[in-house]
Amino acid sequence: MAYQIDQKMIHDQEPMAEIMPNVITAMSSLLQRVSETNDDLSRPFREHKRISAFNAVTKPSISIRSYMERIFKYADCSDSCYIVAYIYLDRFIQKQPLLPIDSSNVHRLIITSVLVSAKFMDDLCYNNAFYAKVGGITTEEMNLLELDFLFGIGFQLNVTISTYNDYCSSLQREMVMRTMYSPLLEPAFLVRSFHKNLLKNLYDEDHRNSQVTSAV
């Protein structure tokens, strides 16, 4: 099946292990900006705001970055799952414009997107009860959120190689922007490693495609 081929190729194109912490930081930074912007935009219309299962009763005290680092530490899913989860979140935003990502739902959307991504991408993954514990919610809530999320993205789980690479490039730009303001990161190594890995994987993909074409 086509989606199985895409899964295999995406796993082959995982970000290099040494830069994954920076990928997590970049994703956190993007989601932080989105949630803060939507908080400001929705404040005048708070009384008419649509409520969903993703909205927490109170804003979680843990930061988005710390929350994602916790998931990264304990979920033990493949690195590509986080890129795919990011893609799923974007699909959710596009398909559910009345449920923008904000500080009340971003944490639950993150844990759910990673769960759904891990189940689709990885051969082995933890169950909902484990993810619920990592995410600080009940298993019943995790089950409900998973179902709501799947319906929210229209069950569009497959990710093409080109889409995956586009989002990798987006995160790469975010990582580069962060290095401009943080002397603790190493921009030259970061960009070179990420770009080299993408080029290698794109070459491998072209090589596979040529083999498939010659075999037909």
Swiss-Prot record:
A GO MF label: protein kinase binding
Domain of life per record: Eukaryota
GO biological process: cell division
Tissue distribution: Expressed in roots, stems and flowers. Expressed in the shoot apex, leaf primordia and young leaves.
Listed InterPro entries: Cyclin-like_sf, Cyclin_P/U, Cyclin_PHO80-like
Annotated SUPFAM superfamilies: Cyclin-like
Signal peptide (UniProt feature, chain positions): none
UniProt keyword annotation of Cell cycle present: yes
Keywords, comma-separated and alphabetical: Cell cycle, Cell division, Cyclin
Pfam family, one: Cyclin
Family, as annotated: Belongs to the cyclin family. Cyclin U/P subfamily.
Family annotation (PANTHER family): CYCLIN-U4-2, PTHR15615
Subunit structure: Interacts with CDKA-1.
Name of the protein in question: Cyclin-U4-2
